[in-house]
């Protein structure tokens, strides 16, 4: 059971976003997809979830084409875009999420909202940038999909909320082991969480190895 990218390439006009990327994300591991802004991280995840089409190459989720209903139902991507109506209240959005994700844990979502002090009766467009991110993370953790994809997940969060999120993420993983991919440029913050590291730079994979191996070799994203 895995996500498999085979020879993925993507260009935007004259800009190379991804070049011949082959990569596997296996179940039951926390991955770090690490790289500077513009390295190609978001493009890769958007191709996986059908928001972008590759120029060449294929993507499969547990053997099914990534753009199939069978595959998409196993994925949850937290990105910059909010997928709920701006004037919808947070509480109503949780109700909606429970309809689309059969394993959605509503009581857990409300528990997370309480810990993060997320106001359930506030409209989504009334949330600050930080609380907008918190809302998306609450839904993501409670959705319990087999593959959780987090693209710069702590955008706008203060230090306290970032640490609370990382702690909750690890607790959630320990209770329900699944494939989690953390795409970020904040390398130091996730170093103790990730088991396997993928380093991407200018659309190419530089390293794809267990985190311990790269740490022992003193690898850095800035290389």
Language-model features: where?
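ABC-family P-loop ATPase nucleotide-binding domains
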Residues: 79-136
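The feature captures the beta-strand-to-loop junction immediately N-terminal to the Walker
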Residues: 31-36
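Conserved ABC transporter NBD signature motif
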Residues: 57-71
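Helix-to-loop junction immediately C-terminal to a conserved catalytic motif
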Residues: 49
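Helix N-cap at the start of a conserved alpha-helix in ABC-type nucleotide-binding domains
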Residues: 39, 159-161
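Catalytic Walker B motif of ABC-type/P-loop ATPase nucleotide-binding domains
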Residues: 148-152, 157
